[in-house]
Swiss-Prot record:
PANTHER family linked to this entry: ATP-DEPENDENT 6-PHOSPHOFRUCTOKINASE, MUSCLE TYPE, PHOSPHOFRUCTOKINASE
Organism of origin: Bos taurus
One Gene Ontology cellular component annotation held by this UniProt entry: membrane
Residues that span the membrane, as ranges: none
Protein name, entry field: ATP-dependent 6-phosphofructokinase, muscle type
Lineage: Eukaryota, Metazoa, Chordata, Craniata, Vertebrata
Sequence similarity: Belongs to the phosphofructokinase type A (PFKA) family. ATP-dependent PFK group I subfamily. Eukaryotic two domain clade 'E' sub-subfamily.
Gene Ontology BP terms: canonical glycolysis; fructose 1,6-bisphosphate metabolic process; fructose 6-phosphate metabolic process
Length: 779
């Protein structure tokens, strides 16, 4: 292991890396550029910026400049790409590529990191395959010497996919997609208020010429009435169907209709469906007041979301490792994301599958196009179809009664989870009840039936509309059992944080005494702290992360103006350091103190010395995050006092406790979508479990697998019995014993210029896309 530790620090000595951004810009590209530069320098390599994409590579000169550590400071929170991007005709010609090769060889650069879409990455692969021919041409014409040719005998290429459309196969999320969704959802939320005031129908056109991802996720995240995407053209009688759907929604009491259209939407015959066509149809047939909004380039703009900054940073680190470990025999690869795992995939395999999708759509093999888009896309489509197109049955014969509740502290996205649970339950023909104020409400009988429109418009609302309490059930088993019988509750969906999980464990224990508690239940993790065992992510954490990030950006801006100032910021999370660590990565913090990574006074001293050194450079500001319970003695005040004293005359310190604003705000697209899918998945499981446990006219479920936590684990959504998770829990500190994100902490330290050892054994290995497709669970 130690051999691997030290290998990373010397991996790049004598090597040079060039980084360029090409094609359409995407938010988060700067985070990737910053990570490539800093990790490159950390490994001992020289790193060069190529300005203006491939055009800069062809033109050379001042377009290729060496980067320094400080030259990527304050880049993280900027949208677009700071080093510029351009569509380049010259590079498509061999002559242009010859000039590009000449520019690289002269600078001794043999590693190229390309951040762009599939066109940019295909170009890079062509460049690599021609490399030796280009060198021999340059040598023949006397532009380079034999020695230079030998030194640069092969070119390593790694691609990072930067595209807001998420149209690249083999990666769950491309850099920029999440931020584009943020822009779209901000606009949808704004339009919703005006549409409701006037009872209007809005047709929103979003980007995506060949890929409907943005349109699909937007419609899931805002509960749209209809979505048009290129991969799944509507049936021939769609006009009838659409108008019927819109009038049904109105008749149920809704004051607005939202229709989302991807710019590349087509019908079954390949004829484009435009926003204007839809508007005219609705006006002509239904006479509704209908408006069209084309979002356009707004979607590419603005600040990158926390997700994109972390994604860009992680991918940048992985790209440097892939380049420096590359040999003439390793294929050009793409670094991508699967679940929350970084993976390396052969570049041309991904490009090929991406082209196959386009071909399948051109040849109208739409089912195949949908399959090739991958499991995440398919899932979104299935859930959308269920929620938007299936009508609840009229009769409730043979139906079961399922109750939904919130437990713990409020988290953004809880309402979205309640909405999808209730609606999927109704679609399956069940009677759905909602419980107010958690287990306390269950004991007091604060329970009512929820119909379809009860949860209308809940997706985008923050907090908990049902009301939530931290009270655990044990003390009130008597009353809870009585109410389970009284309301004939046959299944329980518990949406909440650590208390929801411990409450689940108590219900399991209580089954021995109370038969009434022998009903299936499922816990959907929803807490800003992300500390529920059995899940890598919980609903609400992404929203909190973005809130912290936005605040840190503003604070950094203030510090940059004041100069020589260090801010100490306290985040929430109980004992769980997820928010502090991830926000540290996303906001470019100098340090993040957390409970899981114990620190001593010596560590605090090292950090102060580090900041003293930093103040000597051009970057005269510091940002330090501290999780609220990271250490009972080294409090925020203690750290602030220590920094103030030690920094006297060099920097001054300020502290900020962010507090409960981290629980509020409207949910981010990630949390809305994640909560909606979790609710649907939980309800499908519940229906199956109730049928399994139904004997002699009543429900009796006492097996361990009838009480589960539904969690996201690496690449799949899985149900795990609460009793099995007991072993994996540190109950005193309310955290799981093992947490995946701890391995991202070294990245935070390296990007903040600490000389630490990076364990490269955890890095991604090359996988193959075809094998990847078949062996995966459906999230």
């Amino acid at each position: 292991m130690t051999h691997e530790h030290h290998a990373a620090k010397t991996l790049g000595i004598g090597k040079a890396i060039a980084v360029l951004t090409s094609g359409g810009d995407a938010q988060g590209m700067n985070a990737a550029v910053r990570a490539v530069v800093r990790v490159g320098i950390y490994t001992g390599a020289r790193v060069f910026f190529v300005h203006e994409g491939y055009q800069g590579l062809v033109d050379g000169g001042d377009n290729i400049r060496e980067a320094t550590w400080e030259s990527v400071s304050m880049m993280l929170q900027l949208g677009g790409t700071v080093i510029g991007s351009a569509r380049c005709k010259d590079f498509r010609e061999r002559e242009g590529r010859l000039r590009a090769a000449h520019n690289l060889v002269k600078r001794g650069i043999t590693n190229l990191c390309v951040i762009g879409g599939d066109g940019s990455l295909t170009g890079a692969d062509t460049f690599r395959s021609e490399w030796s021919d280009l060198l021999s041409d340059l040598q023949k014409s006397g532009k380079i010497t034999a020695e230079e040719a030998t030194k640069s005998s092969y070119l390593n290429i790694v691609g990072l996919v930067g595209s807001i459309d998420n149209d690249f196969c083999g990666t769950d999320m491309t850099i920029g997609t999440d931020s584009a969704l943020h822009r779209i959802i901000e606009i949808v939320d704004a339009i919703t208020t005006t549409a409701q005031s006037h009872q209007r129908t809005f047709v929103l056109e979003v980007m995506g010429r060949h890929c409907g991802y943005l349109a699909l996720v937007t419609s899931l995240s805002c509960g749209a009435d209809w979505v048009f995407i290129p991969e799944c053209p509507p049936d021939d009688d769609w006009e009838e169907h659409l108008c019927r759907r819109l009038s049904e929604t109105r008749n149920r009491g809704s004051r607005l209709n939202i229709i989302i259209v991807a710019e590349g939407a087509i019908d079954k015959n390949g004829k484009p469906i435009t926003s204007e066509d839809i508007k005219n149809l609705v006006v002509k047939r239904l006479g509704y007041d209908t408006r069209v909004t084309v979002l356009g380039h707004v979607q590419r703009g603005g600040t990158p979301s926390a997700f994109d900054r972390i994604l860009g940073s992680r991918m940048g680190v992985e790209a440097v490792m892939a380049l420096l470990e590359g040999t003439p025999d390793t294929p050009a690869c793409v670094v991508s994301l699967s679940g929350n795992q970084a993976v390396r995939l052969p570049l041309m395999e991904c490009v090929q599958v991406t082209k196959d999708v386009t071909r399948a759509m051109d040849e109208r093999r739409f089912d195949e196009a949908l399959k090739l888009r991958g499991r995440s896309f398919m899932n979104n489509w299935e859930v959308y179809k269920l929620l938007a197109h299936v009508r609840p049955p009229k009769s409730k014969s043979g139906s079961h009664t399922v109750a939904v509740m919130n437990v713990g502290a409020p988290a953004a996205g809880m309402n979205a989870a309640v909405r999808s649970t209730v609606r999927i339950g109704l679609i399956q023909g069940n009677r759905m009840l909602v419980v107010h104020d958690g287990f306390e409400g269950l004991a007091k009988g604060q329970i009512e039936e929820a119909g379809w429109s009860y949860v209308g418009g809940w997706t985008g609302q923050g907090g908990s509309k049902l009301g939530t309490k931290r009270t655990l059930p044990k003390k009130s088993f008597e009353q809870i059992s009585a109410n389970i019988t009284k309301f004939n509750i046959q299944g329980l969906v518990i949406i909440g944080g650590f208390e929801a999980y411990t409450g689940g464990l108590e219900l399991m224990e209580g089954r021995k005494q109370y038969d009434e508690l022998c009903i299936p239940f499922v816990v959907i993790p929803a807490t800003v702290s992300n500390n529920v065992p059995g899940s890598d992510f919980s609903v609400g954490a992404d929203t909190a992360l973005n809130t912290i990030c936005m605040t840190c950006d503003r604070i950094k801006q203030s510090a940059a103006g004041t100069k020589r100032r260090v801010f100490i910021i306290e985040t929430m999370g109980g004992y769980c350091g997820y928010l502090a660590t991830m926000a540290g990565l996303a906001a470019g913090a100098d340090a993040a103190y957390i409970f899981e990574d114990p620190f001593t006074i010596r560590d605090l001293q090292v950090n102060v010395e580090h900041l003293v050194q930093k103040m000597k450079t051009t970057v005269k500001r510091g940002l330090v995050l501290r999780n609220e319970k990271c250490n009972e003695n080294y409090t925020t005040d203690f750290i602030f006092n220590l920094y103030s004293e030690e920094g006297k005359g060099i920097f001054d310190s300020r502290k900020n406790v962010l507090g409960h604003m981290q629980q509020g705000g409207s949910p981010t697209p990630f949390d809305r979508n994640f909560a909606t899918k979790m609710g649907a998945k939980a309800m499908n499981w519940m229906s199956g479990k109730i049928k399994e446990s139904y004997r002699n006219g009543r429900i009796f479920a006492n097996s361990p697998d009838s009480g589960c936590v539904l969690g996201m684990r690496k690449r799949a959504l899985v149900f795990q019995p609460v009793t099995e998770l007991k072993e994996q829990t540190d109950f005193e500190h309310r955290i799981p014993k093992e947490q995946w994100w701890l391995k991202l902490r070294p990245i935070l330290k390296i990007l903040a210029k600490y000389e630490i050892d990076l364990d490269t054994s955890e890095h991604a290995h090359l996988e193959h896309i075809s094998r990847k497709r078949s062996g995966e669970a459906n999230v």
